[in-house]
Amino acid sequence: MLYIYYLFKSLFFHTLFVFSIYKDCPYMRASSPETTSAVKCPFNKTAVEGTHNKDWWPNQLRVDLLHQHSNKSNPLGETFDYAKEFQKLDYAALKRDLHALMTDSQDWWPADFGHYGGLFIRMAWHSAGTYRIGDGRGGAGRGQQRFAPLNSWPDNVSLDKARRLLWPIKKKYGQQISWADLIVLSGNVALESMGFKTFGFAGGRVDTWEPDQDVYWGRETTWLGGDVRYGAVSEGVHHPDEHRGAKEKAAKNSDSRVLENPLAAVQMGLIYVNPEGPDGRPDPLASARDIRETFARMAMNDEETVALIAGGHTFGKTHGAAPADNVGPEPEAGELEQQGLGWHNRFGSGKAGDTITSGLEVTWTKTPTQWSNDFFEHLFGYEWELTKSPAGAYQWVAKNAAATIPHAHDPSKKLLPMMLTSDLALRFDPIYEKISRHFHAHPDQFADVFARAWFKLMHRDMGPRVRYLGPEVPVEELIWQDPVPKVSHVLVDAQDLLALKQKISASGLGISQLVSTAWASASTFRGSDKRGGANGGRLCLAPQSQWEVNQPQQLSVVLETLRRVQTEFNAQAGDKRISLADLIVLAGGVGVEQAAKRAGIVVEVPFVPGRTDALQEQTDVSSFAPLEPFADGFRNYVKGDEVVPSEHLLIDRAQLLTLTAPEMTVLIGGLRVLGANVGGVKHGVFTDRLGTLSNDFFINLLDMGTEWAPVSKERHVFEGRDRRTGVLKWTGTRVDLVFGSNALLRALAEFYAAVDAQEKFVRDFVAAWSKVMHLDRFDLV
């Protein structure tokens, strides 16, 4: 696989959404016109037009990112169960309706070649294609293409029409099919209706009802800009002060083509690469370098990349009938009467043969509504010379070729074969050429690789197979799905758990060892693409067992001890067994219970057995490398130099763990006093009762008898000294002190520091701990 570790050497990509806090981010400033109807509204002086906190303090900590997608924006209510609704769906009837739609050309948006297949393939591709392996964000899983910024990206021109074509079907089937699932399924049906056998389809994508705010799309301030993501000050992560002059430095180094992590697209508003070539320069070899980088960050290898480009470009066409100055504003900037549609085209009829989308005017094959090997026939069958589309975009025309390509809307016309710069990359890059010639000679293998790569593209952000719904889920298990074995043993019961807890307590392992190991196992979970977590026990396997944050030496001691407990238990007669994955989580719960008891509170940490242990051969090391945290504020850990304030990295980590602000707060307070810091550092350990689950962290942080000061100009670590005597009392990091500094987090800290809060603190910690331990247990939902 090409997404090799060097692409992620800094592992900054887990954290980059935090750039939305910086004032030069385009999404920090509204793009609405200066004068709106609100000014003339009789209800003047509303909050909408007022100055907001972010206007005064653009670098505020984005605690609000932990409270996205609440039921206040969701009309379905808390009891709605999409999986149950999906099971009621007449799936066969839905597919028949989608098949019929493919050739039901509408006058308001006529189908190219009488078939909407190419349009729906593009819509599905552009929905799923925003996924990036770096932080797991993007992808088709939430139907985000309906909302800004994606609904208004330059690369998504005309997809507003595709979704409107789908609306009658969505209306018919209601909540039994989500927009997210319907968009992907329409792409599958489009392929099938044009003679291609797909690998399968899985439903289960649950719609959201507002834009994701946590996704970092880049810092360019113009559409199709790429001036910052290449040659940036560092690999995509900066302190706010470093943004001064970032664009100038980027411009000087743009030839380096070092793409900022975790971004995959080469320009703001594109899904992948610029089809004209890097920065519009028609150089196929340079385009190949961009393609390899961006598809690798999409978790695709070279073979999958060639298959996806060639397979996708077997169908349909691009649109560039006239220059872009004929096109109106995007949907988010449209007038009310446009009803959410954008890019109104003033050229000719504005549709059919007059359509302007990318500005390119290319039909790749003689049969654009039928699966074929024509793409490779043309790629290698002609020599190519540079030309321009009617819109002025660079593209390539076949030399000395006959006009054999059909016109999309005039059957009497034939056109010359055309290709994009990004297509020719598959011929002129030596590695891509070898793969392309192989596919040319072996069309059956091409079809199989494309089918599998398309399925991977559509499902990469869905997580494990247990989340898949529907009658077309493939039987075959794939390595990128992070498979875990099925439970093949009798699960432990309450009596067994009691005996195991006693064994763990008597094992000699301390509270900090038990707690930190369980946290290391479970906290890899990413709510973005549903990867990671404790199930599979991959903490015991490469690469996780060697991550610095997991303290490999201590980890090996803990795992060896727990294996002895496991071996002794599993040696008993009968089929009852416990996996190491389960035992790690159970042991963490034992540590929490012991610590709570020391605080005078008896609790039982919830535990549900059923995890299994994955094998090393079920674990793609390079695919798991991006899950290694660059920073984990819960363990007071930052790898290398702290180039982004660590409190912002904490928000990123908490958001990936799907935590609320109170859950994040209580976990920080508890993990500090339980000694979970990496390396046993004392920063933030504001207690003299280490191993006791007390609220001491909050009490001592908020003590006005302590005066804090940074220990260096970098301001990463602080000393807390007695305000009267100057005696050193504590040390803390930015993550620790932010709970006294940030107004929202201080309010929560004050709640847990109150005299009557000790028991509440313990029970809230147990609840938040249990949530993290079970985040990947989709089998329980």
UniProtKB/Swiss-Prot annotation:
Provide a GO biological process annotation.
cellular response to hydrogen peroxide
A cellular component term, taken from the record's GO annotations: cytosol
Query: Could you tell me which InterPro entries the record lists for this protein?
Result: Catalase_peroxidase, Haem_peroxidase, Haem_peroxidase_sf, Peroxidases_AS, Peroxidases_heam-ligand_BS
Note the position of the cross-link Tryptophyl-tyrosyl-methioninium (Tyr-Met) (with W-125).
272-298
Active site location: 126
* EC number(s) given by UniProt: 1.11.1.21
Question: Does this entry carry the keyword Oxidoreductase?
Answer: yes
Q: Where is this site: Transition state stabilizer?
A: 122
Q: Which reaction does it catalyse?
A: H2O2 + AH2 = A + 2 H2O; 2 H2O2 = O2 + 2 H2O
Location of cross-link Tryptophyl-tyrosyl-methioninium (Trp-Tyr) (with M-298)? 125-272
The record describes how the cofactor is bound as: Binds 1 heme b (iron(II)-protoporphyrin IX) group per dimer.
How is the protein altered post-translationally, as described in the entry? Formation of the three residue Trp-Tyr-Met cross-link is important for the catalase, but not the peroxidase activity of the enzyme.
Keywords of the record, alphabetical order, are:
Heme, Hydrogen peroxide, Iron, Metal-binding, Oxidoreductase, Peroxidase, Signal
Residues that coordinate or bind heme b: 313
Q: Which GO terms describe its molecular function?
A: catalase activity; heme binding; metal ion binding
What is its cofactor?
Answer: heme b
- Region feature (Disordered): 237-256, 317-336
Q: Any signal peptide, and if so, which residues?
A: 1-20
- Subunit field text: Homodimer or homotetramer.
Q: What does this protein do?
A: Bifunctional enzyme with both catalase and broad-spectrum peroxidase activity.
| Similarity remark | Belongs to the peroxidase family. Peroxidase/catalase subfamily.
Listed name of the protein: Catalase-peroxidase
Q: Which organism is it from?
A: Xylella fastidiosa (strain 9a5c)
